[in-house]
């Protein structure tokens, strides 16, 4: 498969998660009314999804190390399709939460296994460039998903957003059946021994550099995720915009993602990964300070309230390809496992931000700015601490257990 086509397929698989997260955001008030539940309880449809997503990322990489990349991806798409159509016709709020959990449990496979496929197929700057290109294409999803969701909601009701994600899943499954190659040869697969797998996870979590770098990636993304989780309140209440106006936040956000990813990919062969990470973290820190200053002195309004969100996304997408690649490379023989754990930590932080942090902060634009700045400070501290650790010791320990 050509590199360009592989990039598009992997980006499409990675986009499935943002579609499931963002398409139904404009429908939060309608879901609250339909099931007669509070807005805080509706927020848990996002938290349940993210918690299931985080938990299952622990298994997809390991399963793909044992059974191959392609079969696990195809199985996950089937489960996601069932969850999507079930959510569309959920008879009660409890069933909606159940089917959202099914979506979350399967949405992460493409993202996790896609990272492993990149590292199976490419190395060094070429791998970093593909990861950056995937992020650039993947970044379109958060922009178009809430816009599509808003128009679908207005035209057909909140259930139509889940019918839409079902349709996208079917198209992705057809694309994978036709063109996704198997990147892990049978001779390279790891035996499926649950005891050894559990020990491998434990050893990886005890590897300080891996854990610290995974936390750095998670909190760098967490400052971005805070605004995604708070989007219904930020856009509909703080900015006073209608359901069809989610593009005011998500289009600038994705412009930053695409711009940072494009620059990261362009510089991958000429600038060291560590330097790009440093530049990205500095950009995020400067943006956090700007966001605090703006919301301290002025009331949040369009277009100025979304500029810091765009700049933060730019810095994050400049840094994350290098941060992700160096984290996975700590365990070169078990990249599926490493990708699972790294994504588990990232999505666990996202779930905590969505379920607990966002409800504490989304009533104030200034509080959201403080939350974003705190996230980048934590990311920088964890990355600095992780960079000081000696890497490689966990890799040899894990190889011996298989």
Segments and roles (model prediction):
Residues 79, 83-86, 94-102, 303-309:
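Paired small-residue
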Residues 183-214:
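Juxtamembrane intracellular "pre-TM" segments in multi-pass secondary transporters
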Residues 95, 132-178:
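Helix-loop-helix hairpin linking two adjacent transmembrane segments in secondary transporters
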Residues 99-140:
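Cytoplasmic helix-loop-helix junction between adjacent transmembrane helices
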Residues 34-36, 68, 89-95, 106, ...:
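Helix-breaking motifs and short loop linkers at transmembrane-helix boundaries and internal kinks
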């Amino acid at each position: 498969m050509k590199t360009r086509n592989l990039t598009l397929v992997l980006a499409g698989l990675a986009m499935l998660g943002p579609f499931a997260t963002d398409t139904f955001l404009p429908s939060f008030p309608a879901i609250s009314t339909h099931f007669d539940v509070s807005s805080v309880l509706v927020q848990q449809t996002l938290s349940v999804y993210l918690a299931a997503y985080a938990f299952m990322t622990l298994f997809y990489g390991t399963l793909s190390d044992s059974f191959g990349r392609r079969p696990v991806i195809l199985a996950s798409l089937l489960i996601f399709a069932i969850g999507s159509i079930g959510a569309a016709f959920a008879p009660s709020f409890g069933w909606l939460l159940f089917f959202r959990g099914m979506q979350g449990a399967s949405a992460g496979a493409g993202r996790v296994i896609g990272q492993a496929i990149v590292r199976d197929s490419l190395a060094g700057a070429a791998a970093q460039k593909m990861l950056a290109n995937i992020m650039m294409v993947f970044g379109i999803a958060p922009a178009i998903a809430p816009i599509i969701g808003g128009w679908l909601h207005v035209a057909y009701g909140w259930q139509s957003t889940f019918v839409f994600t079902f349709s996208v899943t079917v198209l992705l499954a057809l694309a994978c059946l036709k063109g996704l190659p198997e990147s892990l040869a049978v001779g390279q697969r790891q035996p499926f021994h649950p005891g050894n797998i559990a020990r491998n996870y434990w050893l990886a979590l005890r590897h300080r550099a891996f854990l610290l770098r995974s936390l750095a990636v998670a909190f760098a993304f967490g400052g971005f995720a805070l605004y995604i989780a708070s989007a219904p309140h930020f856009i509909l209440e703080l900015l006073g915009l209608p359901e069809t106006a989610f593009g005011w936040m998500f289009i600038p956000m994705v412009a930053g993602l695409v711009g940072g990813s494009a620059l990261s990919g362009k510089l991958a062969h000429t600038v060291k990964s560590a330097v790009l990470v440093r530049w990205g973290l500095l950009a995020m820190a400067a943006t956090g300070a700007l966001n605090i200053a703006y919301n301290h002195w002025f009331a949040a309004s369009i277009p100025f309230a979304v500029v810091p969100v765009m700049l933060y996304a730019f810095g994050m997408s400049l840094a994350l390809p290098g941060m992700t690649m160096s984290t996975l490379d700590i365990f070169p023989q078990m990249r599926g496992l490493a990708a699972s754990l790294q994504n588990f930590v990232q999505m666990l932080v996202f779930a905590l931000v969505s379920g607990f942090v966002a409800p504490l902060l989304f009533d104030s634009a200034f509080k959201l700015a403080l939350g974003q700045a705190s996230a980048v400070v934590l990311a920088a501290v964890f990355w600095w601490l992780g960079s000081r650790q000696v890497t490689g010791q966990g890799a040899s320990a894990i190889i011996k257990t298989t």
